[in-house]
Every structure is written in C-alpha cells, then in structure tokens.
Amino acid sequence: MAVSVADRNSFTYICAMQHITESIRELYKKWKGSAPVSLDVLPQSGSERRYFRLYDNHQSVIGTYGANIKENETFIYFSQQFQQKLLAVPEILAVSEDKQYYLQEDFGNISLLNKLEEGGFTTPVYDLFKKSLEALAKLQVKGDKGLDYEQCLTNKEFGKQAIMADLLYFKYYFLDALRKPYDKQKLMDDFEALSNYLSHTEYKYFMFRDFQSRNIMVKEDDSIHFIDYQGGMKGAPQYDVASMLWQARANLPDAWKYDLLEDYIDAFENTIGQSVNRNIFQNQYNGYVLIRLLQVLGAYGFRGLFERKAQFLTSIPLALTNLKEFYLNQSLGIIVPEFNKVLTLCVADEVIHQFTPVQAHEKTPLVVKVKSFSYRNGVPVDDSGNGGGFVFDCRGILNPGRVESMKTQTGRDKQVKDFLEQQTKMTEFLNSVFDIVDISVEDYIKRDFENLSISFGCTGGQHRSVYAADALVRHLKNKFKVRIELEHLVQDAKNWINASTPSK
C-alpha cells in the first residue's frame, strides 16, 4: 500500500522526538544513576531549542536539546563561569558528549512577566523588578571579570558595528516601508554619529542582550534567576536596563521606569564601588532605549510588513506609542537633526493611525460566529439570514490525527498544538486567513453590520479545525475587540470525548 506524504512526515516527526527524548533520558540516567520517573515536553520558545522537565521523587531538572552546538557551548560556558561567582543563573548538571543535550537546574514555570500579569503594578511586583535589576548589576560586573568573550555566540562586543546594524534594521524594515521623504545621506551621517557616541561609553561589562521579564524566573521564595543569556557579549550596562524597563508587553508606568532606573544606578554604583556621573549615564541610557525601541520596530516591520504575520502587525501601534512617549520626553545628549526629523515622521498621529485597527465598542452590533466542523457532516448552515460566510478547508494541513498518541486528543491539547505549530504549515495558513478575514471584520465594524460567519472544517472536526477556530478567535479579540460566538460542532456534541478511530 502506498504511503502518503502526511504519513511519512508524521513518522519522521515521531522518530525525531523519540530519539531526542531517549537521549535526554539517557543523559539523566548517567547523571543521576537512575532513570527519571517521568518526562514532560515543555512548550517551544522562539528558538529551535527543545526543553523537557524530568522528575524523580524529590526534584525536577530541565533537559535541553539544541542542534546549534555553538549556541549550547556558549550558554554552558557562561553558566559555569557565572555559577562559580554565585550569580543568579542555573547550574549545569550534565552535558552529553556531542554537546547537543544538557541538563540544568529547574527554576520553575513562573517568570517575572507572569508575576506582572497576575499582580499588576503593585508594590510586591515592583520589589521583584528592583531585585531583578540588583541581580543584573552583579551579573554584569562580576560576570565580566575573567570572562572569555571569544566564547560569545556572535559578536564579542556590542560596539559601533552592532549599533549600526540595529539602526539599519529599523531603516530598511520599517522606515523605508512608510515611504516618507527624508535625506538618506544625512540620516546615515546621523546614524554614524549616534553609533560613535553610544559605543564610547565609560562602562563596559557583560551585556545580557535580551534582558526582559520573560527571561527572569521567580521561585516560590521570590528569589530571582536568569535564563537565555547565550546571546550575551561585552557592552554598555544601560542597554539591558533599557530592554527591561521599555519592554512593550510589560508597559511599565513612567514612575516605575524612573524609580527603577534610579534603583539600578544605586545597585550598579554599589557593585563597582564608586559613584557615576548620573547625567552622562542617563543620556547614554536614553540612547540605548532609543536603539532598543527602533530595533523592536524593525523586527515588527520585518515580521509584519514583509512576512505578513498578523500578530506583529498588531504590535506596531504600541511600539510606535512607546517610541513617541520616549522621543517627546527624553534627551539623547547629541545633535542628530535628520534623525530627529525621521523620528518625528514615525510618531506622527497619521502613522500611528495607519497601523491602528478599527475596534469595536459597547454599541457595535457586529457578532462574529466562528465554528469548527467535520466535512463528513457537511458545511454548517448560516442561520443569520445572510446566506453564508467564510468557510476555510484545513484538510491541506498535515493531520495530527494520523499520529497514534494524538488520535484521541483535540486541537486544544498541547501535543497537538505543538505538532501543528512546529511540523505543519498551519501558521502560514492562518496568517492568510487573518489577512482575508480582517478586511471584512474592519469593514463590518465601520458599517454597523450585525453578523459574520466564519467556519473551519477538517476530516473529523477534532484537530486542525478546532485549533484554527480557536486561533482566529484569539486574533479577532486581540485586534478588533469584537464580540464572538464560538462553537465547535463536533466536539461540543461529543462532550470533547473522542474514541480512537482512524483519521484521514
């Protein structure tokens, strides 16, 4: 019997994951002397690394698989060096001979960002941010001593070249996409001047590079621990502070930004054992805030405007608002006239409005009805009287139901979601769906229409259509704040209980 491409891909995925988990288990056994009692696959982050939590009866550890051996070596080296100095990083417990697998200390599941989202702008959360910045100062200064920067993953130092790269990233992937007039040569001259100014800082220590609240873990005793610093290099300490305090998703109040910066400078002075010129330190900090904000806009522009990924497009208005708030209230300490002209163009109300979607309000009559269904039962009827709406066929997406371990699961189960996000073209499919649907939703909100029907179908109405319908609901709520009625026709009828039957 012929084997389909879907079957081959499913088999390849299963074999690859089985090999990885077996290798992680074997490394654990060599380290501990016994096999783990259980192993959980953790959600994959933005990188290609895979994480696992391994348990015995008393503790858990994190297992990591990474095909990029250089990246693994950098993280392991930094961790071992920092651990010797009792800094807030995980202990490396074991490393495989091929350096593709390693075990590290487990700090739990709760990040500083989780604490902020749960607790809001409260004193206990502020104290965690302050504690994180105090630990950062120690990591930067003490971690720098004796560190071999030849071990860095990319550049050894965040100097003029790296600063220019971030500025050009913003220029090519966001500024030029606006098609606004500016003097290109004068702007390049200003980029050169700003890069020189920021690279000639008095203080250069270890720079985390991606110091954000999602990379800071908080244990039950409120102790602070850092992860994901393998992109670190030598650089200005202000960059990491700027990354944390101006993280768009955290959206910290101005008072917090000011007070936490003062807290950090106090901690930095205590760590280096001398006072700093706060005016100069603040001006250079402002420069790095700007670099970070522009780098983020470049990333959103590349992912959103060029790759057409909807979630990045919806992030642009907040990033522009952040940039406007900073630009109108802070000084760089350097004269860059064409650069200032460009920033004024970028934060103009018309540009922010250009990227801000129309949103529903309390009196908006529109209700979007989203359904998942099985093609075996036919396309669902639109009972609004409009004769139908969008129907998207998910059967071209590789089917998780062909994998034995996922046959009785649904599009809401973690293993299925991981499979669809990592092993199929579901993300590309949904980005195209979002582009199509957004046009109608925006128009219907403006014109006070009352109904829009959107349905997703697959073979059994269990995996792909369920995942896609849920994803669209999240997208529409986040972007348009519109009222939605969600119905999973097959799963609701079965009370989400699925027998193990063959899928096609």
Regions found by a protein language model. Name each.
Residues 11-101, 205, 219-224, 346-347:
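Conserved NTP-binding catalytic cores of kinases and kinase-like/nucleotidyltransferase enzymes
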Residues 24-31, 144-156, 161, 166-206, ...:
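An alpha-helical support segment within catalytic cores of ATP-dependent transferases
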Residues 52-165, 176:
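ATP-binding pocket architecture of kinase catalytic cores
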Residues 298-359:
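ATP/Mg2+ or Mg2+-diphosphate-binding catalytic cores
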Residues 356-452, 492-494:
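C-terminal accessory "lid"/substrate-recognition subdomains
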Residues 450-473:
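Catalytic cysteine-centered active loop of the rhodanese-like fold, especially the PTP/DSP P-loop
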